[in-house]
Amino acid sequence: NPNYVIEASDKDIIALKEKVVTEFFFEDQNLTEYYLEHKVLWLNSDDRIEEYNKVYLPYASNASLVANKARVIKKTGEIIVLDASKILQAENEETGSKYNYFAFEGIEKGSIIEYYYVEKRRPKYQGARVDIESDYDKQFVEFDLYAPTNLLFNFKSFNLETAVVKDESSTEKLHWQFAVKDLQGIDREEQAPYTAAIGYLMYKLHKNTANNTIITSYNEVAQNLYAFYYPGYTEEENKLIEKFAKKIAINADEDEENKARIIDLYLKENIYISESGNDELK
């Protein structure tokens, strides 16, 4: 068992380890992806404990969960391993889709939760994003990608000094890796594009050397990711957007940059986000 060390800290959460491993290979002549996520989190506040009492596992109709394990390590050193009865399944009443989650018990301030899962899924090779930074400190973060020797991947890092590098010692398969230590958390700020501000990686399948085919460009990657983060609107939503847009006074002769600045200023002066909730607002 690894020996995780925590120095005295007033932080509410610290990631001792976060690791993502994804491997592409051919299974019955079909390209398949196995995706592993492993996290070790030190929790030191009631809010964070409540947040991580349940950890939801990914669900997709074209994927299956092939392995998972979780445990709690208390300050005293006592270890509580989650057995099968603590890996629960729930159902979304609206969509009918089912999902699994870890139901942690016995977490106290200063406890560590550790979990991993392995998912078999349809390969995401036309553009995928891996977040490296978040709103809490991280001691160690790793990313590894393995692929058959004929499939070449491209990588880009954003808001990071470290880049993905190829492991030249790997011969039976291609291997790219990324590792970084001691990352500071990035605070969430109102009206700030948080997902664009944190450090993250993007990767995509670039070339199949078996037939010398270029698979996809970063323009296609950007389109795929944009469609994922900003899905299309309904007809009713489009009408509301058009109605709202008419309130913004923009001269048709303005260039695109000035139009963007005018829209940005209008949104900041007229749109407010409230953290409070009330049934009467529904």
PLM segments and residue spans:
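Lumenal/extracellular ectodomains and adaptor appendage modules
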Residues: N1-R121, Q126-D137, V141-E142, L281
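Secretory-pathway-linked proteins and extracytosolic
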Residues: N1-N3, K120-Y125, R129, E133-D135, ...
